[in-house]
Every structure is written in structure tokens, then in C-alpha cells.
Amino acid sequence: MTTHKDIIISGGGIAGLTAAVAFGTAGFDVLCVDPTAPVIDRSNQGADLRTTAYLQPAHAFLQQIGLWPLLAERSAPLQIMRIVDAARETLVRKDFNAADISNAPFGWNLGNWDMREGLLTRLD
């Protein structure tokens, strides 16, 4: 059996799935492959429970490919950015408030598990 695809993506993590959604949205016929079975329950071993900060350019991209409506309710706005310099004897901290430069937050924090669920929903 021969199957034609425009794009084959190796890796079904967040980056690979995001690429699959983006290329699919652009009209390409995409196949995303991964050597491991997907983790479909957040309580299973291998579930990625970390979070990622998506800044303004990423937010615009997620809007463009139709993902943001699936993710917005699960995200938390990043209103304060704290920079910490722990390399000195005395800890140095500086806070920046997004309201000082814009009406929008710096970005949004989103659980990797939530992102993965949104990606899989969008691919269905």
C-alpha cells in the first residue's frame, strides 16, 4: 500500500503536534509519527505536568492556526515578569508589570498536558 503525504513529522510531542496542526491548517496533507504510544491519561507515567509560558508572538500563532479558542480557558495570563539574579551573594530581583507597557499580558502560562489535549482535539 502506498500513501502520499505532503509532510511527514517525526515526533508527537508538543512541537511535532503543533507543526502538524499548522501545516494541516495551511492545507497540507500531514502525517505525524512517534515511536511511543501516546499518554492519554494525566495520571499515567510519562504525562507531562509541567507548564510553558507562551508570549505574545506565540499567542498570535496559536490564534492563527485555530488552537487558542481550545486553550484560552485553561491558560493563566502572565501579568508580572520577575527576573532573579541568584549568582551574586545578595539575591537581586526585579519585577516588570505588563500594564506598564500594554493592556495585554506578557503572555500566558499553559499546562503542557492541556496544550497536548488541545492539539489532539484540533487534529481530530
Regions found by a protein language model. Give the residues of each.
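Glycine-rich FAD pyrophosphate-binding loop
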Residues: 24-48
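Short glycine-enriched, charge-decorated loop/helix-capping segments at active-site entrances
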Residues: 44-50, 101, 105
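Conserved N-terminal helical subregion
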Residues: 76-124
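Short, basic and Ser/Thr-rich N-terminal targeting/leader segments
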Residues: 3, 26, 76-79
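Short glycine-/small-residue-rich flexible loop motifs, especially phosphate/cofactor-binding loops
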Residues: 20, 59, 63, 120
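N-terminal Rossmann-like FAD-binding beta1-loop-alpha1 element of flavoenzymes
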Residues: 5-32
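N-terminal FAD cofactor-binding segment of flavoenzymes
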Residues: 46-87
